[in-house]
């Protein structure tokens, strides 16, 4: 369709593909008899695959990123190309409907912790992808913002209790 900007990154990585990849990884781990830790859970499809596997007694854990809990795909359509490119990461941000599932997973325990995948690039480095989103280096910052963002958007809004906050940032990881 001629999408060459940061929005093309999101279009090229739909949530259904993430969900299918999660299902496949769960199946392979189960066949091999090994546990599975799914990183960067960004969508309902992936979370639901993890939730079902855990209900079946499989040793599967899932980890959303703070970015996927608080930002959405509208970031890629920002009129400032630099702003949009600074948010290119994989998987990409999804529409807001997926966030409700991720928060529910943290509340119920089907998703076990929150991470950042901190991998920052300068604006100059991100500009390598001008005219071709596939050349935008994947990664965003987030390490310094994870705890206050999770407290504000989790505990501060009633999505998480203080005990759930401690669990998804410390206890479950240990």
Residue ranges: model-predicted function:
Residues 7-33, 112-114, 120-174:
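His/Asp/Glu-enriched, well-ordered alpha-helical/loop segment
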Residues 1-114, 130:
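Histidine/acidic residue-rich metal-binding segments in metalloenzymes
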